[in-house]
Amino acid sequence: TLDVAIGGSINDRITNSTRIDSKNASLKYANVFNLANIVMSSSASIDQKIDAHYQLQSVFATAQIGYKEGVFLDLTARNDWSSTLAYTKYEKKGFFYPSVGVSFLPDKWVKMPEWVSFSKLRGAYSIVGNGVPPFITYPVSYVTAGGEILASDAAPFGEMKPEMTHSVELGMEWKFLQHRLGLNLTYYRTDTYEQFFKLPALAGDKYAYRYVNAGDILS
């Protein structure tokens, strides 16, 4: 048997935010956080206004191949284009991440004792990509109250790479005595690479911070 699915998606998100400095730091009613509930003073002002537009475009495909109802091969592939990776080499090509999984049902191929009701062996390898927050690859300035321009304190990182998580999973499942007793064992390992960090810049740098890709988290 062969089952195939192909698709695409667009995640488009627009954020408009306004920060108001009331000069009083108090609310009319406790724990009600909206502009109308702020106690304003005569010197209150709009401290900062930030607008952000984020878009993630994706294409993906899945396929499952089955053989004699006893062996199954599952394949997936996905490519994402994230607006937060603009001004990097991933702006045009995006980032690709696949997965492959195999499951085998021994009882479909080998005659099992009557007390064995079900048996399954499985294994999978996958890669999952993740973009970065906005305003990392390109510096952004904000206009504050009084017309002051607040520049970004971190250098643009044009070499930014998407975070990637590699996973391996092996397992088995057995059912005995007409499914009254079961055994399910799983081994998995995940490695996350290319995390991004905001680190203090060297003395004399025109920026206070710089971004780097680093790290390897194993679980």
Whereabouts are the PLM-identified features?
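Extracellular/periplasmic, surface-exposed regions of secreted and cell-surface proteins
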Residues: 1-219
